[in-house]
């Protein structure tokens, strides 16, 4: 009788394990994919180059008052924003970023996500901040930058299309330029 009980429990645990794999397959696939995409390290040289690209771009966009919203993905993945955007997957260059944000371009609205030296997504919708005491002159782009930075560790750069001012947002705090 113990042999039968042992066999039933062994079989049941096998079927439960297989059932769990089938039921949670999409989540497991996404989790394994995310583990495979974790950057082990980014060299200081690569970081400097990426920052330089973003600085060049936002300065040029600010000069001609073209609005921009750029999030640099760090350790917290920007999954919700990514799912709302369009996959771009190209090298992050000033020319490419300027092309994306050029007015009337099909993907100029929303934010861009940069991971490493790649533009991964464009036309992303970032969550708006719920802070009630923000300056009423801040537009949607700035509110989206603050909102995303409240939920993630991504530094975000904003160019105002009204004033050409460049702002930096990190962990819910904005520094206006």
Where on the chain are the PLM-derived regions?
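Residue-level signature of transmembrane alpha-helical entry/exit and packing/kink sites
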Residues: 10-14
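Divalent-cation
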Residues: 4-6, 16-19, 24-25, 29-177
